[in-house]
């Protein structure tokens, strides 16, 4: 998952042609937008969309095509053009399907106009967008993405509920039902506006990378994100083959590949355990748990407590009887109290209930006899 402005592109997309074309200085445009947001109690992203729309009046036709055309002029960081296909190929060679998503407060229409989007680089672009009238002219915000609601899109990606209007994103999904677990996610961003997403990905076991402009070498923001525990890695925003970022992401894909193998293995073992449990009652599971507890008893007091619980249950399985006999032979915390009345009574009944004596039962009989003589 990627932010866009200053993550894939060196500057805000609006500042790379659009703002200038409507006769504004870039800094003055953002100042006007922020003042509107502050004075009106308006979301900052809604404010810039409003100012864009208003300032276009009488100067240009504010259509999707116009915005996409401005998007086609947006400069991208080195290597971005072939990054997405290259990383997809690397993942495929390691058994990992790579999907690229944009989660940006910028304009979807402008992002769609970039070379990367036109080459179908992205699975989905989640960004602010306009609603257009029957003439194709923008009249109202259709969707606004800000730094706090960005996180909903991570949940949509995780659950495979990609439609922004699908309420199933709020449904409970079991871990093995998640389409893309967060442990398999990589989030790349550049600033505090990415922090909620970075935090969410990291908390889910995934990776968050902070990037900075290699031209300016200004690492102030990534240092802060590292200091605040928002990222574990940072690198120059150079997406070229062989770059630091390229190596870092490939190393993460390698780890995801291994993790997927381990998760598949764990899943198979879990299914085996569940098949074993099918048809077994709560009493069956309770009995086995107590037998294991007796095998691992660390004190005489624990032994007496476990035996009291076992006496309440019926022990009919030959395998379970052998496990109990083995516990008395191998665990001193059991063997040394065989002469105690409750333990003696339990093991005597256990042996008497066996149709065919075993080596273990004969050994326990001898120990019981010895303990009786000592008493």
Residue ranges and their predicted role:
Residues 78-101, 105-375:
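C-terminal cap/substrate-recognition subdomain and adjoining C-terminal extension
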Residues 1-134, 225, 229-232:
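Alpha-helical substrate-recognition element adjacent to the catalytic core
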